[in-house]
């Protein structure tokens, strides 16, 4: 069974993230969306909330599992009994960062493989940071995130 782990903060999940999940689910037997827990970072949503939001928007994709993790990604891969990291790339700067991370992960565990998917053209401009910024200024985020979670984001932003 070919299992890939798609790690990220997903704060919040965007249409770009969802596109990579859907496409990854067609390539791999199973995709584990790994929601990063970093106690030193300030998130809009707690990790448990991010997990629930992702579950909501992926409920119709049978071969997707959502889990949270902290610590080293290579250790989480072992826990999941896989060696494959799935990453989405939007820009050249994403590539440079992921290229470095792939080498670091390979250094930590030589069996680790990183598979990169190019973002769909319609999603290249979307990031979680952009979504939060647009929402904070009262902009329309309907083309940026799944419709099912717009109210969650807007109510959290407007606290």
From Swiss-Prot:
Q: Write one Gene Ontology MF term.
A: pantetheine-phosphate adenylyltransferase activity
Q: Which domain of life is it from?
A: Bacteria
> Where does this protein act, in terms of pathway?
Cofactor biosynthesis; coenzyme A biosynthesis; CoA from (R)-pantothenate: step 4/5
Task: List locations, semicolon-separated.
Answer: Cytoplasm
| Keywords recorded for this protein, A-Z | ATP-binding, Coenzyme A biosynthesis, Cytoplasm, Magnesium, Nucleotide-binding, Nucleotidyltransferase, Transferase
- Catalytic activities: (R)-4'-phosphopantetheine + ATP + H(+) = 3'-dephospho-CoA + diphosphate
Mostly located where?
cytoplasm
Q: Which enzyme class? A: transferase
Q: Which residues does UniProt call coiled coil?
A: none
Q: What residues correspond to the site Transition state stabilizer?
A: 17
Family that this chain belongs to: Belongs to the bacterial CoaD family.
Protein purpose: Reversibly transfers an adenylyl group from ATP to 4'-phosphopantetheine, yielding dephospho-CoA (dPCoA) and pyrophosphate.
Q: This protein is called what? A: Phosphopantetheine adenylyltransferase
Question: Gene that codes for this?
Answer: coaD
């Amino acid at each position: 069974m070919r299992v890939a782990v798609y790690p990220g903060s997903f704060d919040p999940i965007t249409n770009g993230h969802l596109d990579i999940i859907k496409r990854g689910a067609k390539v791999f037997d199973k995709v584990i969306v790994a929601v990063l827990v970093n106690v030193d970072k300030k998130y809009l949503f707690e990790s448990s909330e991010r997990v629930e939001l992702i579950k909501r928007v992926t409920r119709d994709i049978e071969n997707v599992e959502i889990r949270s993790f902290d610590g080293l990604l290579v250790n989480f891969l072992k826990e999941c009994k896989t060696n494959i990291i799935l990453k989405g790339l939007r820009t050249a700067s994403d590539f440079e960062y992921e290229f470095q991370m792939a080498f670091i992960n390979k250094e930590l565990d030589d069996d680790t493989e990183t598979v990169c998917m190019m973002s769909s053209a319609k999603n290249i401009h979307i990031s979680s940071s952009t979504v939060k910024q647009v929402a904070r200024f009262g902009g329309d985020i309907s083309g940026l995130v799944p419709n099912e979670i717009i109210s969650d984001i807007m109510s959290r932003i407007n606290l």
